[in-house]
Amino acid sequence: MADSKTLLYSYQRLLEAEESRDIFQGLTEFEVMTAVAYDYFAHEELDYVIMEVGMGGRLDSTNVCQPVLTAITSIGLDHVALLGPDLASIAREKAGIIKPGIPLVLGKLEAEASQVIEGIAIQKQAPITAYDRDYQVELEASCLSGQSFSYHSSKREKAPYQVALLGHHQARNAALAISICDVLFDREGRELLSRELVDEALHQVVWPGRMEVVSQNPMILLDGAHNPHAVAPLIASLRELFPSQKKTILFTCIRTKALEEMLIQWQELENSRLILTSFEDPRAYSQEEIRAAAKKHQLEEVNWQEFLKN
């Protein structure tokens, strides 16, 4: 983890390098931080860096490096105003990270998105490793300590693993990570990581805000699902882990997200009580708008600070 002094050093270097070009005019915070991150990574001489795209891919500020491997985890209808109205359009933007001859690893994708992405990869002669075709995942037990699954591919024999995250989708994400490591190590002529080392690493995974258990008594989970594509697996996981227990959902989102669609999803969750709230942020729905949505769907609306106190 970089400390503040190191980050300020990289930021100062960036300011000095671009002082005469007025390049900072109109830049977003994410673009500035991406540039600072690249400078920091170069200064630290790291062996590998995992850069996550901010939005889309083709025009994203992270898409300025020459990668050793690219990966696309999943695609849903999000940021449609900027990326396009359908999965095919969004897939084309995501595929902008694909580079000629550089391996591409794919997670579980809808056929519409997969067809677009694989077509672009073939055009660029980027070797493809695809979910369910080149590597397989068999979902097993779920519990509050994590998700068990088995994994196998042409590079790795079938074996059991457990990731310390909740939800079947996290098992698929873990499988994608295994495949990425195997493809990368194979490309570099290195010995693959042992099953024991991979499993040990997966047991140590921590992902704040992703079905994060923040209290056992009472049981409280924190999750950042903010679009229908993310809400669906969250609801599926809650159904599996807490089938008969009563569940209270405290929910809100920002203006650019599909509030109405997500409310319909949440109302289909059995044994649950859905409560809406608002928060202070320029992008957030106002308290009045949240109250109107609550009234329309016959839901409760609360102040989240007061709710947590009680």
Regions found by a protein language model. Give the residues of each.
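A conserved short coil-to-beta-strand element within the FAD-binding core of flavoproteins
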Residues: 133-142
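Active-site-proximal loop->helix
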Residues: 1-14, 81-98, 117-120, 259-265, ...
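C-terminal helical cap/extension that packs against the catalytic core
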Residues: 110-120, 125-129, 219-222, 228, ...
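Nucleotide phosphate-binding/pyrophosphate-handling subdomain across enzymes
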Residues: 48-53, 60-63, 67-71, 75-80, ...
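ATP-dependent carboxylate-amine ligase catalytic core
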Residues: 1-65, 83
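Acidic-glycine-rich active-site phosphate/pyrophosphate-binding loop
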Residues: 7, 142-157
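Conserved catalytic-core segment of NTP-binding enzymes
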Residues: 55-59, 65-126
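Short catalytic-loop micro-motif centered on adjacent basic/acidic residues
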Residues: 24-28, 104-107, 221-222, 248-250, ...
